[in-house]
Amino acid sequence: MKIDKYSAILGNTVGYHDMSTLTSHRPVASLPFDGKYRLIDFPLSSLANAGIRSVFGIFQQENISSVFDHIRSGREWGLSTLLSHYYLGIYNTPVENTTVGPEYYQQLLTYLKRSGSNQTVALNCDVLMNIDLNQIFHLHNTIDRPITVVYKKLHLQNISEVNAVLEIDETDHVTEQKLFDGKDPDEVYNMSTDVFIVDTPWLIEKIEEEAKKEYPQKLRYILRDLAVEYNAFAFEYTGYLANIHSVESYYHANLDMLENQKFMKLFSPNQKVYTKVKNEEPTYYSKTSNIKSSQFASGSIVEGTVERSVVSRRVHLHQGSEVRSSLLFPGVVIHENA
C-alpha cells in the first residue's frame, strides 16, 4: 500500500562534535534554541511545511529520552494522524564511529520498504536552517539524477572538520567531495549541508549493497560518496544557516537571533517553525527590571538587568541580578545581586 509520496530520514548530527557538558545528558537535537525551541524543531518543521508525514528518526541509544519527551506524539509537526508515521530507530554504535552495526540498516530498510515513497530526504539537526523542501523536490524531479545535495557557501570559520566540502562544475553537478581541511580564511567553500534528496527505490538498492559489507558505513558517508559517483545535482541554499559544531558556534547562533535580519531569514513567514506546545503564563517583568536587546520565552520572572541575551522558559532573574551577552537555559535562577 502506498503511504506517501515522500519519506524522510532524520539524524542527530553530521559527525561527532565536542559540545562539552551541553550534550552529557541529551543529543545535539534536543539543545534549546532561541528560548522556546529545540534544534530538532527546525528539520521537523521543514518536513511538516513540505507535507511530509512519514519520518524515520535514527539516533544513538545513549541519552535519547529527551527526544522522546520533546516529540511525544508528533502532533505539532503533523505526525499524529492516521495517515502519518513517525518512527525512532536506535543504534548502539558510538557516535564518533564511521561504521555501524547490523541493527542500523535493518531498521532503516524496513522503514523505507514500507513507506512506499518515491523520494526520500535525509537531513540532520546540527545544520540549522529553515529550508523549503518542496522547491528542492521539484528540481530533483526535473533532472536525470537519482540524488540531489544541498550546499551553502561559507567561510572557514563556519565549517568544521566533520563537514564535507564539494567541488561543483559549471552545470551545478558534484564532481568531488572531501572532509573539510581548508586553511584560507578568505576563501568561500561549498559546504555540504548533508541534506540529500534521493529516489527511494535506488536508495534501498544502495543501502542493501552497503549492509552486506563486513563494516558498513553510516548513511551520510554513503550518500556523500554516491553524490560524487552519480554527479548529483547541487542546490545552493541562500537562507540563514548556522553550523552547530561547537559550544562557541551554538552560542553565536543563538545570539544571531537578536539581529533582526538574521531572525527574519530563519523564521520566515512562509516557513513556519513548530515546537512542543506548553501552556505557560507570559513572562513577568517587574518595575526593577531593565531590558535591552534581548529575547524571552514564556513563564519567566525578570526583576534584574538583561542585555543582549536569550532567555529560555521558567527562568527567574532576581532583583539586582545582571545578565549580559548570555544564553540562559530553561529553569535557570540568577540570585539577587549576582
For each predicted feature, which ranges?
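Unchanged
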Residues: 1-255
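Left-handed beta-helix
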Residues: 1-12, 201, 210-338
